[in-house]
Each structure stands twice: as structure tokens, then as C-alpha cells.
């Protein structure tokens, strides 16, 4: 088990910022293998304003985005760019997305991603999001990496 990674360190691993950062903390990872992170879901999330008034539910596509961000963190922890460069991960595809549980304010979403394969600049991962021991969402994710100048 590795030390946890807080939000300030996450900001060095992802380009996302408020209101679109969907990973609050990494609680465990092993480079080139897996990563476990959490997203604390609060009523303050801007998407709850319209999804849905009086019955706030986290949109499924944002659960997928949270998994994609977790996979980007794992990829960035797993290899280093050249001096003066950084990696940007583009969401390139998704397969087998399934939604099993609604996510509401007060839930803590546990994001688990596992590296399935990596070839050159393409990363394949399987992601699952849980609330407690209940599976909320799962998907197979594909991302493409581009090395960009800082």
C-alpha cells in the first residue's frame, strides 16, 4: 500500500480544476497495476442544480468521468514525461458501461481502476465505482496520451 495522495498532489497529476475535478483523494495504488480513489459527493456539486431538482442524482456520465480521471492519475503515476513536458490523457473510448446504483449527496464514491493493457500511447483500463460495497458503475476505458510542453 502506498501513501495516500491528497487533492494538492492530484492537481499536479491532472489538468482538471473546479468544477470538473472528480477525484478528491487517492487511497491506494500500485504503478502499472491499479488505483483506488474517492470522490465525496456533496449537495454543493453544481450538477445537482438541474439533475434533478428535488431529487438530486449524480449523472452517470460524471461517474464515468470520475473513473476516467482516476485512470489518468494511474497512468501519470506509472510513467514519466521528458524534461519540461507533461502528459495529457484524452478519453478515447468506452465499452461495457453499466449503471447499477444511483449516487446522491452524502455518498462517498470509491473509484477502482485496473490497468488491462498499455501499448505506446494507449491505455486500456477497467473501472468500477462503489458506494460502500454496492457497485454503482463499471466500464472499460480507453485513453490516448499526448506529451505536451509545460
Curated annotation (Swiss-Prot):
InterPro entries: FabA_FabZ (IPR013114), FabZ (IPR010084), HotDog_dom_sf (IPR029069). Coiled coil: none annotated. One of its GO terms (molecular function) is (3R)-hydroxyacyl-[acyl-carrier-protein] dehydratase activity. It catalyses: a (3R)-hydroxyacyl-[ACP] = a (2E)-enoyl-[ACP] + H2O. Signal peptide: none annotated. Disulfide bonds: none annotated. PANTHER family: 3-HYDROXYACYL-[ACYL-CARRIER-PROTEIN] DEHYDRATASE (PTHR30272:SF1). This is 3-hydroxyacyl-[acyl-carrier-protein] dehydratase FabZ. It comes from Legionella pneumophila (strain Lens). The lineage of its organism: Bacteria, Pseudomonadati, Pseudomonadota, Gammaproteobacteria, Legionellales. The gene is fabZ.
Amino acid at each position: 500500500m502506498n501513501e495516500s495522495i491528497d487533492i494538492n498532489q492530484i492537481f499536479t497529476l491532472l489538468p482538471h480544476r473546479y468544477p470538473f475535478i472528480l477525484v478528491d483523494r487517492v487511497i491506494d495504488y500500485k504503478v502499472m497495476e491499479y488505483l483506488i480513489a474517492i470522490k465525496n459527493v456533496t449537495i454543493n456539486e453544481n450538477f445537482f442544480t438541474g439533475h434533478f431538482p428535488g431529487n438530486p442524482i449524480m449523472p452517470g456520465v460524471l461517474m464515468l468521468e470520475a473513473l476516467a480521471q482516476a485512470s489518468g492519475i494511474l497512468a501519470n503515476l506509472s510513467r514519466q514525461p521528458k524534461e519540461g513536458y507533461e502528459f495529457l490523457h484524452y478519453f478515447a473510448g468506452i465499452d461495457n458501461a453499466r449503471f447499477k446504483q444511483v449516487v446522491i449527496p452524502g455518498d462517498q464514491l470509491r473509484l477502482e481502476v485496473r490497468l488491462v493493457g498499455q501499448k505506446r500511447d494507449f491505455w486500456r483500463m477497467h473501472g468500477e465505482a462503489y458506494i460502500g460495497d454496492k457497485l454503482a458503475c463499471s466500464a472499460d476505458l480507453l485513453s490516448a496520451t499526448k506529451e505536451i510542453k509545460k
